[in-house]
UniProtKB/Swiss-Prot annotation:
MF (Gene Ontology): ATP binding; glutamate-tRNA ligase activity; tRNA binding; zinc ion binding
Class in the EC hierarchy, top level: ligase
Function: Catalyzes the attachment of glutamate to tRNA(Glu) in a two-step reaction: glutamate is first activated by ATP to form Glu-AMP and then transferred to the acceptor end of tRNA(Glu).
Sequence motif 'KMSKS' region, location on chain: 240-244
The protein's Enzyme Commission number: 6.1.1.17
Protein name: Glutamate--tRNA ligase
Annotated residues for binding of ATP: K243
GO cellular component: cytosol
Keywords (A to Z) from UniProt: Aminoacyl-tRNA synthetase, ATP-binding, Cytoplasm, Ligase, Nucleotide-binding, Protein biosynthesis
Cross-referenced Pfam families: Anticodon_2 (PF19269), tRNA-synt_1c (PF00749)
Locus of motif 'HIGH' region: 11-21
Catalysed reaction, written as an equation: tRNA(Glu) + L-glutamate + ATP = L-glutamyl-tRNA(Glu) + AMP + diphosphate
């Protein structure tokens, strides 16, 4: 009988949820959901100096924002140290591990000698079969695995294919340090086994770890999980992903105005493909996702593609939900509190009314908020340089006449204000554009905006007449 699928995401809380970590979590989540299994979350907090509660909170918050949920309680690796030590002692008792009394100076000399001779194996195994009675006084021993000396260690990886390491090149890895703390290699294996993990999906920078960890599985006679080591994310130029490329925390993408659904869609296509399909609903991702469809070569991060995809998701979004997303965004941007103070039911209603025109022009929520700025701007409007250039003395006189032409319009709608403006332009012998642009500048402070008659309708009669008065001669 096939075991139910159990995946896990196991970040180290030494910083934010990196974009690569977000993709790893997504792949684990998709695979578990596709197979009706579970995805577990383990915080690998054994590095006590670098692990912080702030980082843990950022990871949990980032996963929730991405829409990635996990099953069961979060497991904290450090809390399981006693169990890790227990397994090391089991291996010791079974003769599959040994105490190593090599001093720090001796280990340094061994490494230097091995490197000078071009050998991959840095530890010479001098305590492997040595009598502990020969131990020097005052040295706290480590516990090392008795790794096989000949043959090879093989992983049949779902992404990388068959990967083999010659055992003669692999050290007897340390399981317990001299102070009794378990190493990462041991802790990961024990936790994955005890948590019932069936599939380990992680970055291919962990591939060398897989060889070490398989040796522990073999020594304990435990079943090895299915392994899938996914390619790392590189910058557009093929170099290692850096901050200028997009090596940011998931929280930074939220603050830049990306939608969770758009980022999920973009991340799933980084290294995985399903024919030529680019846009996926979450359910389509779950249905289509499979490990063999992940490529081996590094995926390249492309901000332009992410922006384009995000723009698609914005245009497809419901107007009311976009207003909610805009309001939520304010918590994460520097100017947010000042704008949030202006949000009331009237502003929300105006934003919803303007949204059909606003969302066609925006690729991010930041752009959307910026384009909507005229709705909650304070009077008198701050004009951008292009708008200032439009407002000549003659234009200001024209704005005064426009205001007079609009004063008696009733009811105040996009259609009625358009009719009034067209009549004014015809009477004045002007093209509609010559009338619309000064009107746009006076009402929005910019030379670009949604349709000018939509702007008139959204702002309402009193606000429009007041803004026109501010800019008229």
């Amino acid at each position: 009988m096939t075991r139910p699928v159990v995946t896990r995401f196991a970040p180290s809380p030494t910083g934010f949820l990196h974009i690569g970590g977000g993709r790893t979590a997504l792949f684990n989540w998709l695979y578990a959901r596709k197979h009706g299994g579970t995805m577990l979350l383990r915080i690998e907090d054994t590095d006590r100096q670098r692990s912080t509660q702030e980082a843990i909170d950022a990871i949990l918050d980032g996963l929730k924002w991405l829409g990635i949920d996990w099953d069961g309680a979060t497991v904290y690796q450090f809390a399981r140290a006693a169990r890790h030590r227990e397994v090391a002692e089991q291996l010791l008792a079974a003769g599959k591990a040994y105490r190593c009394y090599a001093t720090a100076e001796e280990l340094t000399a061994m490494r230097d000698k091995a490197r000078a001779e071009g050998r991959a194996k840095l530890y010479d195994g001098s305590w492997r079969d040595r009598d502990p009675s020969e131990a020097p006084a005052g040295v706290k021993p480590t516990i090392r695995l008795k790794a096989p000396l000949t043959g090879e260690t093989v992983i049949e990886d779902q992404v990388q294919g068959r990967v083999a390491w010659q055992n003669e090149n692999l050290d007897d890895l340390v399981l317990l340090r001299g102070d009794g703390t378990p190493t990462y290699m041991l802790a990961v294996v024990v936790d994955d086994h005890d948590m019932g993990v069936t599939h380990v999906i992680r970055g291919d920078d962990h591939l060398i770890n897989a060889a070490r960890q398989k040796q522990i599985y073999d020594a304990m006679e435990w079943e090895l999980p299915v392994m899938a080591h996914i390619p790392l994310i590189h910058g557009p130029d093929g170099s290692k992903l850096s901050k200028r490329h997009g090596a940011l925390g998931v929280d930074a993408y939220r603050a830049m105005g990306y939608l969770p659904a758009a980022l999920r869609n973009y991340l799933v296509r980084l290294g995985w493909s399903h024919g030529d399909q680019e846009i996926f609903t979450t359910q389509e991702m779950i249905d289509a996702f499979d490990l063999p469809a992940i490529g081996r070569s590094a995926a390249r991060f492309d901000f332009a593609k992410l922006e384009s995809l995000n723009g698609h998701y914005i245009r497809q979004s419901d107007d009311h939900s976009l207003v909610t997303l805009l309001e939520d965004l304010l918590k994460y941007i520097p100017q947010g509190p000042a704008i949030a103070a202006k949000f009331d039911d009237s502003i929300r209603a105006k934003l919803t009314q303007a949204m059909p025109g606003l969302k066609e022009r925006a690729k991010t929520l930041i752009e959307l908020l910026d384009n909507a700025g005229f709705i909650f701007a304070d009077r008198p409007l701050a004009l951008d340089p292009k708008a200032q250039a439009v407002l000549t003395p003659e234009t200001r006189q024209l704005i005064g006449r426009l205001r007079a032409a609009l004063e008696d319009v009733s009811p105040w709608t996009a259609a009625t204000t358009e009719a009034a403006m067209r009549a004014f332009a015809e009477q004045a012998g002007l093209k509609l554009g010559a009338v619309a642009q000064p009107l746009r500048v006076a009402l929005t402070g910019r030379t670009t905006s949604p349709g000018i008659f939509d702007v008139l309708a959204v702002l309402g009669r009193d606000e429009c007449l007041s803004r026109l008065a501010d800019q008229s001669a």
